Amino acid sequence: MHESFVFASNNSGKILELQTLLQDFNVKIIPQAALGVNEIPETAATFIENALLKARHACEITGLPAIADDSGLQVNALHGAPGIYSARYAGPNATPQDNIKKLLAELSNIASEKRKARFYCVLVFLRHVKDPAPLICEGTWEGIILPEQLGNSGFGYDPVFWDPIKKASAAQLSITEKNACSHRGHALKLLISKLARTL
């Protein structure tokens, strides 16, 4: 692959993860902000639809193929919330810490065995803005919500997401360890295999 793709995100954590995961491939990932693309509101009802909105917007502005991600945290005890509202769970201008505080408050009376959750990620790839057959790849990462924060790495809800297999929070893992088991890592591995067959 000798390609340049625009990544339809301004999230520095996601950009770093994607660039790290693709470093062994001859692919240049250009963050959309570097090409003058602004973020658009995530107005759809599902992760997949939101990712497609973002990818189409980036394609239309840049003329480049686009990769877009939509992801979030789904907590069983909260009927799948925060879900598509993960980034703005505590309000439209919420910080990651605001979101974590709200989540922990809502789970304060929930026993540890009922705090199961998963990170979900969908990655979509559009060859051009009118691509009728976008590549859509999904990944999940199963875990438990901790009662307090652990670790200083990562971003978002990572400090309160416990991986029972790794016996660590997502924020205690190195980026290499995280990419090996994360929702985004799983989705990107699928996307890479599909791209290798189609480009």
Regions flagged by a language model, labelled:
Residues 2-6, 12-199:
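Anionic-ligand binding patches
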